[in-house]
């Protein structure tokens, strides 16, 4: 883009007219596809704007001096505390971006705040100012998939448990309370699983710079004091996290402001940490937290990439549909930070990683407590294929109650784990964790395998082959009601009822879609029966070149 010029002397504020000087006209205008691809490989972007002087409030905000490897999610996160981000344009070749807020008031609050507090991404200060354009308008080209998937993920967050719609008010309140403490007092109730200092740091860092943490036990409760760099971050974290669960249905956060205004940390170890003083001694008198917690919970250790994530979790505790916060590198942490499944699905659709999404880099799942007499690679391929494109499946030769399932990426693995863990398959509740393996190895030529390892990398049954596939918008947890599609006109309701009851299941209800008889809902006697029916009948040949498509439904009959 010829109109984008190198940054000039610090302290001189530039209007965005300089960025688009070669392609701006009065009224609506278009960035040329050549200039856009030169900057970021994106297709042409359309804008509607008018001539405005630099610094005049606008919903569109110009961000400069971004790190080279910055992600869409990180850029969007700059605007989250102030309101809803409605559009995004990345110019990675120029280390710049434009974001559009839902209101001018939100944008104004954001610019005012970052004028007094310089934002930092990946250790690098960045610069924020108003754009002279009233709105961003992007097209629907394939190259926009990542940005749009990121926005969809964030919008799912904002409409979900975090209630970030109130965050602009939170920022205003925090800025108005100059005397408010930046220190939070955190109590973790219903402590079924270990909560470590690093777990708290991962969660609370989403809302600002964490300076210090001290953990302790008081009145038989695990507690912590956490100091942010500023009161605004503390206010945002309190509003967003108070009452949330770290893990499924347990480890509930209760958060209040501390009377302290600063923490004095003497040691950097598993109980306390000063992130501004890496030179502090460790104080070897205390045993490491992961060892003591593992002993307290009586659970076996699990190999983990994180030294603070070694404690095992009780294997029988699994409530798959309860939302929790995600903890990277901690096995058993299911749902992401109060992010509904739609957010993870949107991320998977765009092949992006949401900051804070558990296991974003690990695509291999360890599935245990399988029925060794009935489980097959094909049954696992079909079931896990509801939540992503399964690449390989290996049932362990000497431990056939265990299997490895490799998904296309870490987001899909997260979706499968959060939806399927604890559900019954062949009469047994399966348990799912992230595997320590990065991929599933195929057997060597001549090696005895008994057909227990299968490669599905090129399977025609993959549901999500296209980036941004609409199938990601229709992912739901296992339920007794199944959604059927691709039904030929010659197949009747009775035909389908007979088909779905042929393997011993009970059909409790059925109805065709009024406007489209190619689709129907069928209700089985239980969730377990529906799971088995999906495995048995997805891709079933109904004749007339129609293969039945089966998925879980959010609706009931």
UniProtKB/Swiss-Prot annotation:
GO terms under biological process: IRES-dependent viral translational initiation; mRNA processing; negative regulation of mRNA splicing, via spliceosome; negative regulation of muscle cell differentiation; negative regulation of neuron differentiation; negative regulation of RNA splicing; neurogenesis; positive regulation of calcineurin-NFAT signaling cascade
Organism from which the protein derives: Homo sapiens
Phosphoserine: residues carrying this PTM: 16, 141, 459
Gene for this chain: PTBP1
Record GO terms (molecular function): mRNA binding; poly-pyrimidine tract binding; pre-mRNA binding; RNA binding
Domain RRM residue range list: 59-143, 184-260, 363-437, 480-555
Biological classification of the source: Eukaryota, Metazoa, Chordata, Craniata, Vertebrata
Modified residues (Phosphothreonine): 138
PANTHER family cross-referenced by the UniProt entry: MATRIN 3/NUCLEAR PROTEIN 220-RELATED (PTHR15592)
Protein function: Plays a role in pre-mRNA splicing and in the regulation of alternative splicing events. Activates exon skipping of its own pre-mRNA during muscle cell differentiation. Binds to the polypyrimidine tract of introns. May promote RNA looping when bound to two separate polypyrimidine tracts in the same pre-mRNA. May promote the binding of U2 snRNP to pre-mRNA. Cooperates with RAVER1 to modulate switching between mutually exclusive exons during maturation of the TPM1 pre-mRNA. Represses the splicing of MAPT/Tau exon 10.
Protein name, per record: Polypyrimidine tract-binding protein 1
């Amino acid at each position: 883009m010829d109109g984008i010029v190198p940054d000039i002397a610090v302290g001189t504020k530039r209007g965005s007219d300089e960025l688009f000087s070669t392609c701006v006209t009065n009224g609506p205008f278009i960035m040329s596809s050549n200039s856009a691809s030169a900057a970021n490989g994106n297709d042409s972007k359309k804008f509607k704007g008018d001539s405005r002087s630099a610094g005049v409030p606008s919903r569109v905000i110009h961000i400069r001096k971004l790190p080279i490897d910055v992600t869409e999610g990180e850029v969007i996160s700059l605007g989250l505390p102030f309101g809803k981000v409605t559009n995004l344009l990345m110019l990675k070749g120029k280390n710049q971006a434009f974001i559009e807020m839902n209101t001018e008031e939100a944008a104004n609050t954001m610019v005012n705040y970052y004028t007094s507090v310089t934002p930092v991404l990946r250790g690098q200060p960045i610069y924020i100012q108003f754009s002279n354009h009233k709105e961003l308008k992007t097209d629907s080209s394939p190259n926009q998939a990542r940005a749009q998937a990121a926005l969809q993920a964030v919008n799912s967050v904002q409409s979900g448990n975090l209630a970030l719609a109130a965050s602009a008010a939170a920022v205003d309140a925090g800025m108005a309370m100059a005397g408010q403490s930046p220190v939070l007092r955190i109590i973790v109730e219903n402590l079924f699983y270990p909560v470590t200092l690093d777990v708290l740091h991962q969660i609370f860092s989403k809302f600002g710079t964490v300076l210090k943490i001290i953990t302790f036990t008081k009145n038989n409760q695990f507690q912590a004091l956490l100091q942010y760099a500023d009161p605004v971050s503390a206010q945002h974290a309190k509003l967003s996290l108070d009452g949330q669960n770290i893990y499924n249905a347990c480890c509930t956060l209760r958060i209040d402001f501390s009377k302290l205004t600063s923490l004095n940390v003497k040691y950097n170890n598993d109980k306390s940490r000063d992130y501004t003083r890496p030179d502090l001694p460790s104080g070897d008198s205390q045993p490491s937290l992961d060892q003591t917690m593992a002993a307290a919970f009586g659970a076996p250790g699990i190999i983990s990439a994180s030294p603070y994530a070694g404690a095992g979790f009780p294997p029988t505790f699994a409530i798959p549909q309860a939302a929790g916060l995600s903890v990277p590198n901690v096995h058993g942490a299911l749902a992401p930070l109060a992010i509904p499944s739609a957010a993870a699905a949107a991320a998977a659709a765009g092949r992006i990683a949401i900051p804070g999404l558990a296991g974003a880099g690990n695509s291999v799942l360890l599935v245990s407590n399988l029925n060794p007499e009935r489980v097959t690679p094909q049954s696992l391929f079909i079931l896990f294929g509801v939540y992503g494109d399964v690449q390989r499946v290996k049932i362990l030769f000497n431990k056939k109650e265990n299997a490895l399932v490799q998904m296309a990426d870490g987001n899909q693995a997260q979706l499968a784990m959060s939806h399927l863990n604890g559900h019954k398959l062949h009469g047994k509740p399966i348990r799912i964790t992230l595997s320590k393996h990065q991929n599933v190895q195929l057997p060597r030529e001549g090696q005895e395998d008994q057909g227990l390892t299968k490669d599905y990398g090129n399977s025609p049954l993959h549901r999500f082959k296209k980036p941004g596939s609409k199938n990601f918008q229709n992912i739901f947890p296992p339920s007794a009601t199944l959604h059927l599609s691709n039904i030929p006109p010659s197949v009747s309701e009775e035909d389908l009822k007979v088909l779905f009851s042929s393997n011993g299941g009970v059909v409790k209800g059925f109805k065709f879609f009024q406007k489209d008889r190619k689709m129907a809902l069928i209700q089985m006697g239980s969730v377990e029966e529906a799971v088995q029916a999906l495995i048995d009948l997805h891709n079933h040949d109904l004749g007339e070149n129609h293969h039945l498509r089966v998925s879980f439904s959010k609706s009931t009959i």
